[in-house]
Amino acid sequence: TKAQDRRFDVTLMINGLPMIHIELKNKQHSYMDGFWQIKKYIGEGKFTGIFSAVQMFVISNGVDTKYFSAASDTELNPKFISGWLDNENNPVPDYLDFAKSVLRIPEAHEMIARYTVLDEEAKRLILLRPYQIHAIEAIREASKMGKSGFVWHTTGSGKTLTSYKATRNLLMDIPSIDKAIFLIDRKDLDTQTSMAFQTYANNDLVDVDKTDNVFELKKKLKSDDRQMIVTTIQKLQR
């Protein structure tokens, strides 16, 4: 097929803009065929113009369904492909079940608006993985009921990104919250976390402030600004 004759399978539009693109294969083919096809389309310049708005790709052969964030053809990497899991950690490979869980309204809207991050430093779009999304949703539900709890993560599972989005979403979703405070238990992580949060916030709608000392922390807590504050337990204890 000539490059000019390419025809996309399915594109989902939000407010008139193409945001989610789906490539479908039959069961005799691997879902990865869809990945390589998308990579080829990007290299051919098919996702330009209005289609440059696409933020999420979905690939499926009917029985295996995956998703990943948009990137250039040279940056598109299979390691960023993720399958969907329900909140009990059960895989959701079937394309219809995936569509019901992820691509309905408002789930598709939330995936794009609430669970996508533009990493300013890496110059890369990030789509959160299912366990991160379920953790953030659990935090939101607990906050509505005035409850607290723990979210357990392992090394390399994206704890900082999960923490940023959880803190950010609480601040954006609940008008009565004036300050969202991210508390760190080790001083050496203060600067590191603040820099990561700022990298995520540079293209977001929230202000992230790092506190250099106790005096500055008190000043920020008393201010009328709605903001996200990164600080340490040590500063609060003084």
What are these regions (language model features)?
Residues 189, 210-217, 236-237:
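Short acidic loop-to-helix transition motifs that present clustered carboxylates
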Residues 203-210:
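Acidic/polar loop patches that form or flank catalytic/metal-binding clefts of enzymes
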Residues 185:
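Conserved H-loop
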